[in-house]
């Protein structure tokens, strides 16, 4: 079920929203759990049991670690076993197909296992629970259904943000939903919905048309526009989902951490990754990079740590060579930036630093988007070989590209924090204006959703 679908907006959300008015927290949690499992079962009925099984592994491992609190060795064995099972499950369903295809020369056949939606996200949440419990950062959750609600809670289940248990530990047991939570959460949800329907979906066709079209009609300019369009599409698609998840969570009394902070205003690749998919970046930092030694090791080991983290980051996004290449490329760029290039970049004017950073990001998204290496190589070469094709000829090749190109203008504007400059204050009339604007935007989104074809979020694939 997609947040932007008619089914979700007019059937599921109103019914699930009734949970807010249930005063008993145990009953409210039970209803939210049932709603979340229904939400997941809507598209993946067979995979609900798999998610519950992974949660059960974490639940039982938690009790075992508490039992062995005075025996560190046994406690660590339990942790390692739990991690092995959780990652093993992720590997089988996400990477086994890829491994068998890669090693097909050994006679291995592709098992064609279906990828459970959201498995990368909920696996990382379960891992954070068992690791943080081992570290003593959180308390044991003795109620299996509460733990399952944390893992399966429908706002963030499919595409994040990756919510750590410590963020919602208290709110699972005790939370109060105020009118401010409902209005603020709904407004945030509508902003995310608008990002998806009014911006991401509209600019998406630029890259689709160019990459699927005859190259003789598209020169370097159009290939750059395609790269920029996909850069905008993936930002508004993914940050839109995060906004909707954060807004929905707020409406039910949960406060999720931010996942994006205007990444396209960054002046360096390092800054970009502090602003993009924050929940994933900090997850790898806290559970992989720092345990490997972080930057408090020799230079050689530090370089190793960076490459391991970014190789895993690439593979987390997808089981294909282009994702691994994308992740390792960013690892190498960050190494060059930290070891040498950074001090020179700081001497450049800010507009030039921003332009260079965005060029790197756009190239990165081309690698991310195109899984076929031949097509990827052609697109990257065409971007930099100054092939000239008159713009009129490119537009005439497929005139349906014109509206998406025009939609790129507002998308570029709203990828910056320009809206943050609008300050209405806290008076009653300002609140009325905000709510009226929100309802108007919601109505526009509904009109777009009625005519839109099925267009799932990009990160549903991961």
Residue positions per predicted region:
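Membrane-embedded transmembrane alpha-helical bundles that form the catalytic cores
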Residues: 1-461
């Amino acid at each position: 079920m997609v947040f932007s679908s008619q089914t979700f907006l007019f059937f599921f959300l109103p019914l699930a929203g009734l949970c807010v008015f249930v005063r008993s927290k145990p009953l409210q949690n039970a209803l939210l759990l049932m709603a979340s499992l229904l939400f997941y079962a809507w598209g993946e009925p067979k995979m609900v049991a798999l998610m519950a099984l992974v949660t059960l592994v974490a639940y039982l491992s938690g009790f075992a670690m508490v039992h062995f609190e005075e025996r560190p060795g046994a406690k660590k064995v339990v942790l390692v076993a739990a991690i092995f099972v959780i990652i093993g499950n992720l590997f089988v369903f996400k990477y086994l197909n890829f491994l068998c295809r890669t090693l097909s020369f050994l006679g291995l056949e592709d098992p064609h296992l279906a990828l459970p939606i959201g498995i990368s996200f909920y696996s990382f949440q379960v891992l954070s629970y068992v690791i943080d419990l081992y570290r003593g950062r959180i308390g044991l959750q003795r109620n299996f259904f509460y733990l399952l609600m944390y893992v399966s809670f429908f706002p963030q289940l499919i595409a994040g943000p990756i919510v750590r248990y410590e963020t919602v530990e208290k709110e699972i047991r005790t939370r109060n939903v105020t009118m401010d939570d409902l209005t603020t959460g709904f407004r945030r949800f509508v902003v995310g919905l608008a990002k998806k329907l009014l911006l991401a979906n509209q600019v998406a066709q630029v890259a689709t048309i160019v990459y699927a079209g005859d190259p003789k009609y598209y020169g370097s300019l159009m290939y750059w526009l395609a790269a920029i369009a996909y850069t905008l599409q993936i930002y508004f698609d993914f940050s839109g989902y995060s906004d909707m998840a954060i807004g929905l969570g707020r409406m039910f009394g949960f406060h999720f951490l931010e996942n994006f902070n205007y990444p396209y205003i960054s002046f360096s690749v390092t800054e970009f990754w502090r602003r993009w998919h924050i929940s994933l970046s900090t997850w790898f930092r806290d559970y992989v990079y720092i345990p490997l030694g972080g930057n408090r090791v020799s230079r050689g080991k530090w370089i190793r740590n960076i490459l391991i983290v970014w190789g895993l980051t690439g593979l987390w996004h997808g089981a294909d060579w282009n994702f691994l290449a994308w992740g390792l490329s960013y690892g190498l760029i960050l190494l060059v930036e930290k070891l040498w290039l950074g001090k020179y970049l700081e001497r450049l004017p800010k507009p030039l630093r921003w332009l260079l950073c965005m060029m790197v990001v756009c190239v990165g998204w081309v690698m991310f988007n195109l899984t076929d290496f031949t097509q990827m190589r052609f697109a990257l070469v065409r971007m930099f070989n100054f092939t000239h094709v008159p713009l009129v000829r490119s537009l005439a090749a497929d005139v349906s590209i014109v509206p998406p190109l025009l939609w790129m203008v507002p998308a570029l504007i709203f990828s910056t924090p320009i809206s943050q400059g609008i300050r209405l204050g806290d008076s009653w009339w300002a609140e009325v204006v905000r709510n009226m604007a929100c309802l108007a935007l919601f109505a526009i989104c509904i009109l777009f959703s009625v005519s839109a074809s099925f267009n799932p979020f990009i990160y549903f694939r991961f």
